[in-house]
Amino acid sequence: TMGQSQGAFTSSVVLYKLNRQDPYASCDLAGVAVYDLGLVGKRYCAVAEDGLHFIDRKGRAAASYSYDGGVLRRCSLEGDGYAAVLLGRYKVGSQLRLVTVNSDGKELGSLDLDGDVLSMSASGRYVAVLFADRLVIYNKNLKEYATLQGVSSAGDVLMRGDGSAVLAGSAAASVFLP
């Protein structure tokens, strides 16, 4: 849930059991607007403007990862035990940093990117980044795994856990098998 207290956003992550109407736990994140919420490993991950906030299954704040002044551009929580975050150095521009973070708030990998990123997706052990002219697939430590050139007709990428990626454009979609 979201609210406001003394002019600042406040988010509360409220946990329910599927067979109960009442919450069994909650965690307040003062001064934070949560954009997305999902599971990373065995913890909930709240994606916010300032960083990632990890909450254990008992509703307690367990760890966090600060963007250190970076601007959130994209985030994918579908990695196997990690979140992939694309950060801009500024609100506009193409100087970007790709980071993978585990549920303890520790960086697994960090990589400076320069170029127009159209889409990003994580699944399993891999992170796919679609640039205007190429697709690059990295492992969760951000070591390059595969590259595909000439993808100008694609506008979106969906990484799959088996290491393949689906490229989608306005007229067609295709699967890249590295």
What are these regions (language model features)?
Residues 1-8, 36-54, 79-92, 120-131, ...:
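Short beta-strand elements that form the blades of beta-propeller/WD-repeat-like
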Residues 28-42, 67-80, 112-125, 152-164:
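Repeated scaffold domains used in trafficking and secretory/extracellular systems
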Residues 8-29, 48-70, 91-113, 133-151, ...:
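Surface-exposed loop/turn elements that mediate protein-protein interactions on large endomembrane-trafficking
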